[in-house]
Amino acid sequence: MSGNHNLDNTTFLPLVAAAAGTVLIAGVFSAAAVALDEEDGERATCQNIGIAAEVISSNLLDGRSKRHASNGSGGHGEKKPRRYVCWDRQRAKLCIMNDYLGSQPSFGPEDFKRVFRVSWRTYNQLRNYLCHVQPFFRPGFDATKREKVSTDAKLLIALKYLAYGTTVNAFRDYFQVGESTAMKCVKLFTKEITTSPFRQEYFRSMTQGDAKRVEALHTAVHGVRGMIGSLDCSHIVWGNCPVAHHGQYQGKEGKPTIVVEAMVDYTLYAWHAVFGYCGTLNDVTIWDNSLLLQAMCDGSFEDIDFPFNIGGEVFQQLWMLVDGIYPPLSRFVKPISVPLGETEALFSLWQESKRKDVERFFGVFKKKFNFFAKPVPFFLWRTF
């Protein structure tokens, strides 16, 4: 593949999770780091788009999407005739250019980023890459010599679906696209993003060079040496959970939930993530099955360690902030549940305030991309 079509390392950092078939399967992936500069917030936002893309694409493995081709009588009797809709594709193309992508658009870069969750720069890089590898996104003409749905409309449909989690029919009046075409846009977008050469770069484990950059960032921001992130879990309410799975996914929250585990740094970049654990599990049971624990046990985590000095004493193991439920490990710094004296009380306050990095990550993860609360539309209906 030509280097001209690769995405910039500093703008698109997809991170993945897994969910397959009608039973969500947890998958663990480590993401890569790049230079920590003023674009950290944009990179973290693009990571969440990558998460949504992988959740959808993994649900499309083997089988066909479930369809309901029936009339009001539940599928019996004569089917209603199909109605032809003449979509005004040119009008949609002009609207997109006039509103967002033209030389003098009605809405500027900030409005575009707020609506579609990515910047113009990232969008243009995505557009160039997808047009290069996927013919579906290239401009052209259909069998009737009419111009196809524009490239921008296809890409913006996918981005908007990931951001809002609503049905694709909600966008047809603006983009002038039918439901089947819109669904194909989402499927091919997520497929190309999650099966592209970016996997070798963005899904690799943290290196010692990455660890040194993140440790230096936390030293400057939090004022302490050796910290590489904060680890925690969070529950996402599964609004469309099938009734048959309620018992498996309904925990203390009283509603079916899906658990997300993540270890993130100050810039909200996730170095480790798990998406898809059942809501009946807690932080401890998830940690017992975590690949992050496996990396600590088999010694591979030691590859990123380097010596650092705290109070005149040299330490060798990098560490992360966790809450009190996690086990007492040398790499975990937990709050003091019953502080004795002013020093311990101040330490507990410091630990709880700095651990808010991972809480901020979960807040962005849930609020900016509503698709995660509604993963059912891409479940498969298998026929034999």
Feature annotation, model-predicted:
Residues 125-126, 157, 214:
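A structural signal for short hydrophobic/aromatic patches embedded in well-ordered alpha helices
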Residues 139-149, 342-345:
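Short, conserved non-catalytic motifs in the polymerase core
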